[in-house]
Amino acid sequence: MITSFPVRNFLPRVTITSCAFFSKESTSAAGTVAEKKESELQKFAGKSNLLEKKKVGIFGTSTVPINTNFPNPKGVVDYDPDFSIKELVAELPNTRKTQGAKLSEEIKNAFNSVSIEKTELLEDIGFVRHNEARVDYRFDTQEKLDLWKIGCDSDWKEGFSTCSLVNSDRGTAVFSGNISTKVLKDGRVERAGWASMKLEDRKAFNRKKFLSKWRNFSHLLLKVRGDGRSYKIMLHSPLSMDFTWGDSFSHPLHTHGGPYWQYEKIPFSKFFHTVAGRIQDRQYRVNLEDTSSIGIVLMDRIDGDFRLEIDYIGVYNDTTHVEDFAYETYTLPVFNTHGF
């Protein structure tokens, strides 16, 4: 007989919320959407009860330590449910089945890729020609679209923005919704109005899949069609230590609007270091060996609907681009606020 006693979940979860795009009913249905989110959250938590919120650090990073039992796809802060051993044991067969199948497929792909005739293998070891491009992420199937998660301030109960990510008839992804800079009158939230989509492509048993295969290319390549707004591309590089969890490298994505596609080639040398979205004084080049995810964020402080259509994301190589890093950096004095 199994005795139930509480086990803390230190990695919170969140549900994925979608909304109608460019719908006049979206504003009037805000209360319904909020109730639906709360209902889904409670259903997802099972019989667990929400505990008292943990304190948040200076950059909004949770003080809750990592727990590998419960992955946190969206990095939601302060959601810390209480699960019993009985619930964990009941979930084990399903976890073993799904993750085991994923591991088997991973091993199979590893053996199939070991061939000198494979173009990807040659690219990974540095044999990349001038003007060569590789497309890594498309959105022509639901399975590929499911690798991407979305979020906005209303998911964190910090605003009223909404967003969705759906397939189009052309086999592309449409990231759309509504940005609202209206601030909640709770005495805590100071700014609002953002939405994002982020890659959550992981290996079996929730292991990170790094983008190290991009290290021999010079540019990030995107084919997009926007609405004239300025978005932001983010390369996320969280490491094992908690003070690196907010590390990312960013670059603006300016869209033209209108019916025409634009091919954006952004040099990796021009990505600047940010922590939780804040530009840092100490700048250094992005290390793609540590980059595990890519995201697109909209936070331009403009109320209204938005729409970004994405055909593919990949990398491009330009051998004439010899710039290592585009921004100034400096050597800190021996005695400084960061230590030796």
From Swiss-Prot:
The keyword Lipoprotein does not apply. InterPro entries: Galactose-bd-like_sf (IPR008979), NADH-UbQ_OxRdtase-assoc_prot30 (IPR013857), NDUFAF1 (IPR039131). GO terms for cellular component: mitochondrion. One of its GO terms (biological process) is mitochondrial respiratory chain complex I assembly. The keyword Chaperone applies. Keywords: Chaperone, Mitochondrion, Transit peptide. This is Probable complex I intermediate-associated protein 30, mitochondrial.
